[in-house]
């Protein structure tokens, strides 16, 4: 490491400390981003990966999907472990046995064709109603696989992707995505690095950047109603002109609402 370098922002490809011995021993201040180096005491700024995947899985499960397939990277890392825990935590919330969790590893190092083949096999084996992707490239390969298989999204399979790629809102349909706050992560990492350069230690304690669930058009709700009726988006439910006339200017009680509910239900079922 060049001693003239004031500081380094480092994105580790591994979380094993022995892979970075020279960097650690150099004395040059550095901060890790996205992944930490285990057992080293090195400062890092990471995304809330467990919380992120929980959000995605929770959204699908709350929409009535019980057969949710989770694709994750096959690498042995804390990031993969945290995302897996988030998925399992969501299943537990809905009283789904985690032993029955549909989790498939995708080995990105094998290349696009092999990854898409693995995804295709998993889709045919598990026949999910919804899929959650655990990484940027997995999301891309998943969408390509669905296209090649002629699977309608979200008609046949709902999809929640992962990442910050601009193409996610340009796909058809626009992709519901777990969007990482990359700018927030970068700002925190730079701030922490300057603290270390100026004082020798990192003063900041907020070492995480958020991940937001951005809901678009690649997911749909399944049957959730009390009578086995289909769930519907609010903007697809409306009263007829006759019903509007009947209810105009009236304070409705429960006995008035129930017939209206059944009428509307019959139109969207």
Which stretches of residues belong to each language-model region?
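Alpha-helical recognition/docking segments in bacterial nutrient-uptake
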Residues: 1-58, 62, 120-125, 245-249, ...
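Helix N-cap/beta->alpha junction signal
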Residues: 12, 49, 80, 135-136
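Hydrophobic alpha-helical segments within soluble ligand-binding/sensing domains
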Residues: 41-70, 85, 89, 111-120, ...
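An alpha-beta-alpha
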Residues: 54-94, 201, 205-220
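Short acidic capping loops at alpha-helix termini that bridge into adjacent secondary structure
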Residues: 66-68, 98-102, 152-159
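Short beta-strand elements in bilobed, periplasmic/extracellular small-molecule ligand-binding domains
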Residues: 88-112
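Flexible loop/turn connectors
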Residues: 116-227
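Intrinsically disordered or compositionally simple regulatory linkers and C-terminal tails
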Residues: 222-247, 254
């Amino acid at each position: 490491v060049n001693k003239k370098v004031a500081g380094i922002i480092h994105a580790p490809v591994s979380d094993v400390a022995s892979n970075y011995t020279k960097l650690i021993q150099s004395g040059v201040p550095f901060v890790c981003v996205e992944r930490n180096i285990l057992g080293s005491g090195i400062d890092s700024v990471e995304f809330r990966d467990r919380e992120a995947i929980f959000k995605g899985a929770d959204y699908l499960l709350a929409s009535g999907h019980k057969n949710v397939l989770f694709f994750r990277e096959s690498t042995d890392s804390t990031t993969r472990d945290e995302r897996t825990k988030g998925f399992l935590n969501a299943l537990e919330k809905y009283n789904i046995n985690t032993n029955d969790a549909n989790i498939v590893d995708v080995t990105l190092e094998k290349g696009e064709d092999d990854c898409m083949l693995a995804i295709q096999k998993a889709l045919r084996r598990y026949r999910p109603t919804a899929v959650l992707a655990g990484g940027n490239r997995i999301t891309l390969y998943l969408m390509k696989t669905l296209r090649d298989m002629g699977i309608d999204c979200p008609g046949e399979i709902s999809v929640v992707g992962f990442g910050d790629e601009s193409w996610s809102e340009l796909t058809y349909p626009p992709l519901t995505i777990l969007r990482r706050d990359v700018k927030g992560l970068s700002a925190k990492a730079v701030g922490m690095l300057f603290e270390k350069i100026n004082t020798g230690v990192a003063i900041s304690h907020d070492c995480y950047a958020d991940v937001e669930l951005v809901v678009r058009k690649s997911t749909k709700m399944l049957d959730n109603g009390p009578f086995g009726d289909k769930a519907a988006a609010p903007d697809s439910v409306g009263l007829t002109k006759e019903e509007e006339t009947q209810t105009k200017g009236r304070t409705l009680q429960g006995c008035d609402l129930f017939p209206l509910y059944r009428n509307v239900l019959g139109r969207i079922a």
